[in-house]
């Protein structure tokens, strides 16, 4: 009746609706941009930003961001040795020892005041006999380096006074590599390596090259975020360093989203990733959720 087949007509209608939708989106974008200084649009933006941040699981809330859940889901694996680099006051180490009853933890904390608080936190703990404290840092090369402690924010210890407006206390830190440490201790394999060192995670991994190339580390957790801008070691670089041997995924409260690298994930939002040896599909299944 109208000079076209039913399928062709449906296609034309669909294309028309799509074009209309695109024009509508363009109009809405323009309206938002023109009124971006208004109170209503500002409130909507803050609400949307909060939603997006939550959707990306941004933040370091150990109890709720999925880090504790990772430990719990790995309980059946009966892990025996974990390395906690950047232990702070021991939240992760305590969680690992509680979830893995046969595991020992080596906890590294380079800041002297934080190291004291870490040791004190375990003095009367029932898991005290399974944790060993090390007042030194791990990096890509051994030696001494000036680092900075922030008394009001002890989790921010790093090798540069990057946080403007915060009091920074310089101190001399002794560093070694994970390869050297394990060689000295006769440690042949690591079940779980957790790294949270304010943007220097890649240095720790480079100092473990021997262990990595020998497939001696089953799982790795590292933090990624805005400090990658300063270090210029991007999420892309972590995938290039690790993806030959590991499957890599972002940690969420109820699952790990394993997958390949995509430039849209290079968002510099503070979050945690976990890597599992490709030859350990059992651990991968536990974590997928």
Mark where each language-model region is.
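Phosphate/nucleotide-binding beta-alpha loop and adjacent structural elements of enzyme active sites
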Residues: 2-289
């Amino acid at each position: 009746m109208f000079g076209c087949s039913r399928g062709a007509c449906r296609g034309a209608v669909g294309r028309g609706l799509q074009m209309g939708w695109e024009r509508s989106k363009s109009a809405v974008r323009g309206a938002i941009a023109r009124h971006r200084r208004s109170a209503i649009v500002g409130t909507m933006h803050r609400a949307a930003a909060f939603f997006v941040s939550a959707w990306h699981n941004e933040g370091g809330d150990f109890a709720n961001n999925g880090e504790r859940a990772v430990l719990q889901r790995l309980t059946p694996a009966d892990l025996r040795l974990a390395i906690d680099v950047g232990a702070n006051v021991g939240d992760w180490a305590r969680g690992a020892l509680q979830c893995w009853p046969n595991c020992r933890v080596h906890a590294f904390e380079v800041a002297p005041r934080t190291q004291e608080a870490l040791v004190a936190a375990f003095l009367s703990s029932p898991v005290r006999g399974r944790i060993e404290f090390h007042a030194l840092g791990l990096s890509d090369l051994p030696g001494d380096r000036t680092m900075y402690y922030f008394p009001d924010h002890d989790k921010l210890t790093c090798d540069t006074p990057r946080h403007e407006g915060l009091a920074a206390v310089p101190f001399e830190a002794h560093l070694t590599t994970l390869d050297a440490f394990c060689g000295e201790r006769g440690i042949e394999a690591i079940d779980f390596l957790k790294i949270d060192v304010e943007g220097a995670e890649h240095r720790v991994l480079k100092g473990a090259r021997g262990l990595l190339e020998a497939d001696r580390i089953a799982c790795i957790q590292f933090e990624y975020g805005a400090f990658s801008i300063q270090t210029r070691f991007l999420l892309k670089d972590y995938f290039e360093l690790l993806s030959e041997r590991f499957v890599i995924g972002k940690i969420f409260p109820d699952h790990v989203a394993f997958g390949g690298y995509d430039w849209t994930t290079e968002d510099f939002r503070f979050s945690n990733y976990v890597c599992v040896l490709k030859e350990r599909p059992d651990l991968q299944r536990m974590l997928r959720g």
